[in-house]
């Protein structure tokens, strides 16, 4: 019920990764990367399916060897989400996964081989309508740029990116997106700002090697949040030394916080104090776990007392305001019922699921009505 943020997205060209539109106003895609051995087909497929279940739009898979390329073929046959093959050094691997239906190639033209090998990869991508992601990373800058700048700088990352962009321009290939990642927030943010002024291709955002689940989420939220609030970014990955599923969850949380894209429940909860009338923290933790399957966008406020509870409930899809023994339940800003504090979790879960079903049905009817008008 909150207003959408007035963020003006940077204009960019449109590409497709599989069936997912990227750029030109398309929803910002959230992606992750598998951390299994790609040659372990079963483990990799299971991880990709877990990522699909939490909403991953795109999944990247490292393909370092020809054996991994053969495994990629089997993996691709068993999943639905578009797959990006992460390839370095050996152009033949890129050609092989292209045969196997890869949806996007992540390469650096600078380390894939000489001009002829780059041309072979680009020609193959063009023939099969496969986009490319140019991935520049502060930790693997070209030696001459390291010597020129002394250390990774925004200008160094920009020069590296433009060098690779020029490779593709010379080959008349424009179906690509670009990333300029760094583990330092300020370095990454300024690099993306510079790049956004130079090209109109889609940008893939990330703070690389951000850290563990907690620290990495914080760094990513700050860095990606700054860029997204300025309208920069068309896809994103939150890089965590953690279960890749957490990367997708944090990615959507960042987008939800900026009111850019919503998926599932946005919980609004107080940090609690001695005024709370029920166990707010336990309630929120339990509901977050129980309701992970809900993809309907909705705001749910869970506030332990009447100080801020009614105000938050006014702008929430559903809201609970703590009261003595029973707490007020609000729906779309209107007080509807009272819930027993001793059975709060089960009651609220049932109400949320019912509301989600109601909203889904309303959207289904709206879509049907629009279809009738069009036809």
UniProtKB/Swiss-Prot annotation:
Q: Looking at its record, which EC class is this enzyme?
A: oxidoreductase
Its pathway is: Isoprenoid biosynthesis; isopentenyl diphosphate biosynthesis via DXP pathway; isopentenyl diphosphate from 1-deoxy-D-xylulose 5-phosphate: step 5/6
Instruction: Give the family, as the similarity comment puts it.
Output: Belongs to the IspG family.
Binding, [4Fe-4S] cluster: 270, 273, 305, 312
Name this polypeptide is given: 4-hydroxy-3-methylbut-2-en-1-yl diphosphate synthase (flavodoxin)
Extract the signal peptide range: none
Can you state which reaction this protein catalyses? (2E)-4-hydroxy-3-methylbut-2-enyl diphosphate + oxidized [flavodoxin] + H2O + 2 H(+) = 2-C-methyl-D-erythritol 2,4-cyclic diphosphate + reduced [flavodoxin]
Q: Which GO terms describe its molecular function?
A: 4 iron, 4 sulfur cluster binding; 4-hydroxy-3-methylbut-2-en-1-yl diphosphate synthase activity (ferredoxin); 4-hydroxy-3-methylbut-2-enyl-diphosphate synthase activity (flavodoxin); iron ion binding
Provide an example Pfam family for this protein.
GcpE
Q: Which cofactor does it need?
A: [4Fe-4S] cluster
Q: A GO biological process this protein is involved in?
A: terpenoid biosynthetic process
Looking up NCBIfam families in the UniProt record yields: ispG_gcpE, PRK00366.1
Q: State whether keyword Iron-sulfur applies.
A: yes
Record's keyword terms, sorted: 4Fe-4S, Iron, Iron-sulfur, Isoprene biosynthesis, Metal-binding, Oxidoreductase
Query: What Enzyme Commission number(s) appear in the record?
Result: 1.17.7.3
Q: Which organism is it from?
A: Shigella flexneri
Family matches, as InterPro entries: Dihydropteroate_synth-like_sf, IspG_bac, IspG_bac-typ, NO2/SO3_Rdtase_4Fe4S_sf
Cite the cofactor comment. Answer: Binds 1 [4Fe-4S] cluster.
The function of this protein is: Converts 2C-methyl-D-erythritol 2,4-cyclodiphosphate (ME-2,4cPP) into 1-hydroxy-2-methyl-2-(E)-butenyl 4-diphosphate.
